[in-house]
Amino acid sequence: MAKNFLIELGTEELPPTALRSLAEAFASNFEAELKAADLAHQGVKWYATPRRLALKVAELAESQADKVVEKRGPAVSAAFDADGNPTKAAQGWARGNGITVEQADRLKTDKGEWLLHKEEVKGKPVQELVVDFAAKALAGLPIPKAMRWGNSDIQFIRPVKTLTILLGDELIEGSILGVSSARTLRGHRFMGESEFTIDSADQYPAILEERGKVMADYDARKAIILADSEKAAAAVGGKADLEDDLVEEVTSLVEWPVVLTAKFEEEFLKVPSEALVYTMKGDQKYFPVYDENKKLLPNFIFVSNIESKEPRHVIEGNEKVVRPRLADAEFFFNTDRKRPLIDRLPELEQAIFQKQLGTIKDKTDRITELAGYIAEQIGADVEKSQRAGLLAKCDLMTSMVFEFTDTQGVMGMHYATHDGEDEQVALALYEQYMPRFAGDDLPSTDISSAVAMADKLDTLVGIFGIGQAPKGSDPFALRRAALGVLRIIVEKEYNLDLVDLVAKAQSLFGDKLSNANVATDVIDFMLGRFRAWYQDEGFSVDIIQAVLARRPTKPADFDKRVKAVSHFRELDAAESLAAANKRVGNILAKFDGELAQEIDLALLQEDAEKALAEKVEILAEALEPVFAAGNYQEALSRLAELREPVDAFFDNVMVMADDEALKTNRLTLLNKLRNLFLDIADISLLQK
């Protein structure tokens, strides 16, 4: 008979940003153990609060099913000697299985007859298995840094206080992480019963809500926070900024969510909203509220972990906490504006970018020069791009950014606007960091794009130039920087070549770089990011590899090739031509002679080779302007016309003829054929 199963681990406060991943991994690991043990069930559901991780398995089988295990022995031909007596090999196998040779069964196959032992294995009761399963599941959690507590050597992400393991109403005895299983559950720290007993797994999680004032269902808590926050924001005429990462963190901080609305003085709205939002979201875990025009309102929403009889006191307490932080932001904003941003430029000499690469002032000088170079290439205003590059890092020296680090860039924009800088220059100070993450917006102007690319390329070339390419960790966010440059170039269709960009960036470091292969290393690294990007976009690895094999260093051109090859692959001729290209590549690789520059028409003998040569020559001439214009999809569609003449050639022509001149001419034809495709990609790498 199947029963519901429960395991709850009571702990001290778990890290909120890791709570969901811990709970999901616990469930996944435990379910994998059940599957490996052939234990039937109707699903595993995880629960998680700041002070507990729990799993409930619906209708878990009470024991493993009995099964018959077949153990094959030696072949009958090797199991008996000429007189029919068991050989030592047969006797040893039988002894190892606790039987005699005579007791063995026979297994007949089309390859012969074998000795066989069928052993009936009784399934173990689930009570004997689940404690070990849970221990293994917990040991496999993604814990970045474990801790010890008390005098024990036991390690876990946080000290463990209670353990409850129930199968139906049966308490399963056992110990995990130094704590023995018991029926005791802990309630909310400030509400409900602090401790109480649970009689059956069926009571979970309802008993926690009823007696402990704890909502163990993580997703249910999150749903309440979202719904109540939306209602609360609407009540003050706005819409809450319910960023998922913050909602997840808040959900992980409370066991009994109570959504409340508070306010702050309107005078603080004179401060750039980004600084206020940084304080509310980053420091206090509050949800800002915006009006229909996306203008910040003097209200915020917060989630309390307690149901107070006097919610006004809770609201006033939170208002009292946030007020000094907003006042700090106001003070920093007013103080910083007393000095023009450009006056802070010399102070960048005091800030180190990287020991071997110099100060942030050095980096600023390089960004300024590189931004001007890029601006010229893409038709942006060079002078404004250089001005933006010069001011790009000056806000790092302001009090606001020093205190609220995530406001860098956006505060530079506000201060530059206050100083009377050009609007696009000011905007570039904010947009220089875009895209900041996968799927983020790109810089909106060419000037911003020039500065953003200059900043990222300077970091890439500099760090690679001193031999610190990312391996496991990526402290300088080089992967993000590389993808950012690629996205800007591709999505804005800039005709830029990584070779030129990297060479220019490298030249600005003077003799600071020690890696002689820095240019190749950076370009290869950036092209490697294409693989991850296009895989995320749904392109298969072989399509990406086919283009990478040609190492095109213009990102916008790379993009055209990938899309063209993807389109080509859907054509009827694709599989045949990919196989033919692979065959041609193999043939040419084995030839160590010298090929001619052109096909000698006089040496063509077979009708099939004449037809192919004619088609290749026609396409080579016709596709020259198509290749030059980068119309790769059109080019591959035309090259698909080669399918029939190529198939006919291989069916009717002996490539490796005895006559050397004839052989060389045929190889020259195949080489010219292959080069037509290689002008786009190596389609021989396409898989079926």
Curated annotation (Swiss-Prot):
It is found in: Cytoplasm. Pfam families: DALR_1, tRNA_synt_2f. It is an enzyme of class 6 (ligase). One of its GO terms (biological process) is arginyl-tRNA aminoacylation. Its EC number is 6.1.1.14. Keywords: Aminoacyl-tRNA synthetase, ATP-binding, Cytoplasm, Ligase, Nucleotide-binding, Protein biosynthesis. InterPro entries: DALR_anticod-bd (IPR008909), Gly-tRNA-synth_bsu (IPR015944), Gly-tRNA-synth_heterodimer (IPR006194). PROSITE patterns: AA_TRNA_LIGASE_II_GLYAB (PS50861). GO terms for molecular function: arginine-tRNA ligase activity; ATP binding; glycine-tRNA ligase activity. It catalyses: tRNA(Gly) + glycine + ATP = glycyl-tRNA(Gly) + AMP + diphosphate. The keyword Protein biosynthesis applies. One of its GO terms (cellular component) is cytosol. Belongs to the class-II aminoacyl-tRNA synthetase family. NCBIfam families: glyS. Tetramer of two alpha and two beta subunits. This is Glycine--tRNA ligase beta subunit. The gene is glyS.
